[in-house]
């Protein structure tokens, strides 16, 4: 049995600023600034490591100090970065956000253009690693072209997290190739045109997805295959 999982997706640095008192716009506010490793792909890889899985992480790092910080984090977690891509002069993916004094987000800025460097050409050089994996997990930060290429060329079971409503559209060309898909209800509704959770799941299965885990916030998860549907609170 294959002993590792490949994760293809984003790693980014989350920078959070939180004021110590009521936020005043257009002024300098005293508070705290924290830096935290993030990114959907990186978080999936982290969770897999916590479960004891061996992980090969295929992602893109820029040529800045953020890249080294994130590389060190991934290595400390035990991820294999042997297939990761370095982009000289590139900006490592960064998410900057400001909250109010209660921690509620007021403004966010996302600089994730480097994910476009994860191209079919780059992945084709690592196709043996991808197809030799027990599973391949991808996120919606990849371009639609890259996702479609993975759907056409990856023979390992393909798992996908769409990330957001807008980025979920990028999954459309590869839906028929997905083994497991984990959208939330809004993402699923926008992809299928269905309104009910049951309708969303049925439509995704009809398009070729083998397993769907539809998250519904406080209403739990609807898990389904073509033969069985289970509601998990």
Specify the residue positions occupied by each region the protein language model found.
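Conserved beta-alpha-beta core of the PfkB/ribokinase-like small-molecule kinase fold
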Residues: 135-199, 218-221
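Short beta-strand scaffold segments in enzyme catalytic cores
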Residues: 94-98, 107, 220-224
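Glycine-rich phosphate/adenosyl-contacting loop at the front of the ribokinase-like
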Residues: 1-60, 65-76, 233
């Amino acid at each position: 049995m294959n002993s590792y999982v490949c994760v293809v997706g984003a790693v980014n640095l989350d920078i959070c600023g939180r004021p110590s008192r009521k936020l005043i716009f257009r002024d300098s506010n005293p508070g705290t600034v924290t830096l935290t490793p993030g990114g959907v792909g990186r978080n999936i890889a982290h969770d897999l490591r916590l479960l004891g899985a061996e992980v090969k992480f295929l992602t893109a790092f820029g040529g800045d100090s953020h890249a080294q910080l994130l590389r060190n984090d991934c290595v400390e977690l035990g991820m294999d970065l042997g297939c990761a891509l370095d982009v000289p002069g590139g900006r490592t993916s960064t998410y900057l956000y400001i909250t109010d004094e209660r921690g509620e987000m007021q403004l966010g800025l996302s600089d994730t253009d480097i994910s476009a460097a994860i191209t079919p050409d780059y992945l084709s050089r690592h196709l043996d690693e991808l197809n030799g994996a027990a599973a391949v997990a991808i996120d919606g930060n990849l371009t639609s072209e890259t996702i479609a290429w993975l759907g056409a060329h990856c023979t390992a079971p393909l798992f996908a997290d769409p990330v957001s409503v807008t980025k979920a559209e990028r999954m459309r060309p590869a839906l028929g190739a997905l083994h497991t898909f984990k959208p939330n209800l809004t993402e699923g509704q926008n992809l299928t045109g269905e309104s009910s959770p049951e309708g969303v799941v049925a439509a995704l299965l009809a398009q070729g997805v083998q397993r769907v885990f539809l998250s519904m916030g406080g209403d739990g998860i609807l898990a389904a295959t073509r033969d069985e549907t289970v509601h998990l609170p």
